[in-house]
Amino acid sequence: MIIPIRCFTCGKVIGDKWETYLGFLQSEYSEGDALDALGLRRYCCRRMLLAHVDLIEKLLNYHPLEK
């Protein structure tokens, strides 16, 4: 859905790093190198970006109030 603002485990702010992370991946960084460049060293913070599935664009196509 939408990337969480803070890490669920340690509380570090990670919400502002999503777009930068995608930019690193577009410029052919590996996932690990991109996370290192963002300063995410803890496993808990790294998994927040690695495991995120961005579904917001797909959900915007649905209009539950229309029949």
UniProtKB/Swiss-Prot annotation:
GO biological process: transcription by RNA polymerase I; transcription by RNA polymerase II; tRNA transcription by RNA polymerase III
Top-level taxon in the UniProt lineage: Eukaryota
Keywords: DNA-directed RNA polymerase, Metal-binding, Nucleus, Transcription, Zinc
The keyword ATP-binding appears for this protein: no
Molecular-function GO term, any one: DNA-directed RNA polymerase activity
Subcellular location: Nucleus
Protein family per UniProt: Belongs to the archaeal Rpo10/eukaryotic RPB10 RNA polymerase subunit family.
Name of the featured protein: DNA-directed RNA polymerases I, II, and III subunit RPABC5
